[in-house]
Amino acid sequence: MIKLRLKRFGKKRAASYRIVAMNSRDRRDGRPLEELGYYNPMTDETNLRVEPLVKRLKEGAQPTDTVRRILEKANIFEQVRA
């Protein structure tokens, strides 16, 4: 199953995350199928690649809880339903 999840990068105690599409059995920092954006919790900054995200969600990719909240803030699910 394909999951949309966060992949950690950045410095110690100053983490940032990439939003990636990965197989659910792969480890957190393994090789992703596709990078779909990034999220910085320190500044609450997000940058999303909308078209590939919508495509992955329509194909049945399951977002984790944290990624779901980030996508809801950006109104991505409204584009999936349309």
From Swiss-Prot:
Biological process according to GO: translation
Domain of life: Bacteria
PANTHER family: 30S RIBOSOMAL PROTEIN S16, SMALL RIBOSOMAL SUBUNIT PROTEIN BS16M
GO molecular function terms noted in the UniProt entry: structural constituent of ribosome
Record-stated family: Belongs to the bacterial ribosomal protein bS16 family.
Record protein name field: Small ribosomal subunit protein bS16
Disulfides per UniProt: none
UniProt keyword Ribosomal protein, yes or no: yes
Organism: Cyanothece sp. (strain PCC 7425 / ATCC 29141)
HAMAP family in UniProt: Ribosomal_bS16
GO cellular component: cytoplasm; small ribosomal subunit
Gene3D superfamilies membership: 3.30.1320.10
Name of the encoding gene: rpsP
UniProtKB keywords: Ribonucleoprotein, Ribosomal protein
